[in-house]
């Protein structure tokens, strides 16, 4: 009995060690976004609350928590209230299989890639439930757009994952990282470059970020699926979006960019200088790079039209992944060096 309780407490501690820093990261990602976009637009960004505006995320959180939760009169009240949780939970449970370094992972399962793919697909249910339960045409339009978008880009993302499985020969994320040992030239983003780019673009679309944020199109459907939400409900949708951004960036770093591996591995004099840097620091740097590109893309590109979004998914990304899967299979059979 005591042994079981001890195991349970240890699991809870491991979950908190992952979730608490993640929530703090989400808070400061919103701050980073406002700062980066501010500098791109030749503005300063938030700089009033705390030193250089560093406490702004907590001020925003306090504001949202203290706001009234308004439930529309003709909405389905129970589904309306729990929909934000349906959106948030998949973006958190995906972290269970993410290895931060060799041996540092909550659940080192052999079907890690499949688990991540399944969890990333579940987030759309929260959006769909929110749109339907709100009993608002704007919310419903946003939810339907998001569902169609997710279905379209999940296919391309799935094919891109198959390419990694072909190359690494495993669905275990730790094994996939270890298959990229030998330095930057051995990372999968080089032989699988088209699949890497497709996965990256699909990840932006999956998280409903600009220029694929049609589900929230302010200029067309007010605020999309969360138009009726305020206070903590709105905050949870906000949280799920940014947590998903961090998760997609982490998956990109693990599958294509060597995860926690040093980029200087195999380069003797640089390897000797940077060998003291822990693996998880390299992983955090790679995640930060992908997150910065998320913000840069949002500030740079205009929103796609709905037909352009669908055309890109079905007529460009899916054919590209199918063709490159065939090329990858041929490279694996031919044992193309230094990757296979």
Swiss-Prot record:
The keyword NAD applies. NDH-1 is composed of 14 different subunits. Subunits NuoA, H, J, K, L, M, N constitute the membrane sector of the complex. It is found in: Cell inner membrane. Its EC number is 7.1.1.-. InterPro entries: NADH_UbQ_OxRdtase_su1/FPO, NADH_UbQ_OxRdtase_su1_CS. This is NADH-quinone oxidoreductase subunit H. The chain crosses the membrane at residues 4-24, 78-98, 113-133, 151-171, 184-204, 244-264, 273-293, 316-336. Keywords: Cell inner membrane, Cell membrane, Membrane, NAD, Quinone, Translocase, Transmembrane, Transmembrane helix, Ubiquinone. One of its GO terms (cellular component) is plasma membrane. Pfam families: NADHdh. The lineage of its organism: Bacteria, Pseudomonadati, Pseudomonadota, Gammaproteobacteria, Legionellales. It is an enzyme of class 7 (translocase). It comes from the Bacteria. It catalyses: a quinone + NADH + 5 H(+)(in) = a quinol + NAD(+) + 4 H(+)(out). NCBIfam families: PRK06076.1-2. One of its GO terms (molecular function) is quinone binding. One of its GO terms (biological process) is aerobic respiration. Belongs to the complex I subunit 1 family. It is a multi-pass membrane protein. The gene is nuoH. NDH-1 shuttles electrons from NADH, via FMN and iron-sulfur (Fe-S) centers, to quinones in the respiratory chain. The immediate electron acceptor for the enzyme in this species is believed to be ubiquinone. Couples the redox reaction to proton translocation (for every two electrons transferred, four hydrogen ions are translocated across the cytoplasmic membrane), and thus conserves the redox energy in a proton gradient. This subunit may bind ubiquinone. Disulfide bonds: none annotated.
């Amino acid at each position: 009995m005591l042994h079981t309780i001890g195991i349970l407490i240890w699991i809870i501690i491991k979950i908190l060690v992952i979730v608490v820093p993640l929530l703090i990261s989400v808070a400061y990602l919103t701050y980073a976004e406002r700062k980066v976009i501010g500098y791109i637009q030749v503005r300063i960004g938030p700089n009033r609350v705390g030193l250089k505006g560093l406490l702004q995320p907590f001020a925003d959180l306090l504001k949202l928590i203290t706001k009234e939760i308004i439930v529309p009169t003709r909405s389905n009240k129970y589904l309306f209230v729990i929909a934000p949780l349906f959106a948030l939970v998949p973006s958190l449970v995906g972290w269970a299989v993410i290895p931060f370094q060799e041996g540092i992972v909550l659940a080192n399962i052999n079907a890690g890639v499949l688990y991540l793919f399944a969890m990333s697909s579940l987030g759309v249910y929260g959006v769909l439930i929110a749109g339907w339960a709100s009993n608002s045409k704007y919310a419903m339009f946003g939810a339907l757009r998001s569902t169609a978008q997710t279905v379209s880009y999940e296919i391309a993302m799935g094919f891109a994952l198959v390419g990694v499985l072909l190359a690494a020969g495993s669905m275990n994320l730790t094994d996939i990282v270890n298959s990229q040992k030998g330095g930057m030239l051995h990372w999968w983003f080089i032989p699988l470059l088209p699949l890497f780019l497709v996965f990256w673009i699909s990840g932006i679309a999956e998280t409903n970020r600009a220029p694929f944020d049609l589900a929230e199109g302010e200029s067309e459907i007010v605020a999309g699926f969360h138009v009726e939400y305020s206070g903590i409900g709105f905050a949870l949708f906000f949280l799920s979006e940014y947590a998903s951004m961090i998760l997609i960036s982490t998956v990109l770093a693990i599958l294509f960019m060597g995860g926690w591996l040093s980029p200087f591995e195999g380069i003797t004099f640089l390897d000797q200088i940077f060998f003291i840097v822990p693996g998880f620091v390299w992983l955090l740097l790679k995640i930060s790079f992908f997150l910065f590109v998320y913000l840069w893309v949002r500030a740079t590109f205009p929103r796609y039209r709905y037909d352009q979004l669908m055309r890109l998914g079905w007529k460009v990304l899916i054919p590209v992944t199918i063709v490159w899967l065939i090329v990858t299979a041929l490279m694996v059979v031919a044992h193309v060096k230094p990757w296979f």
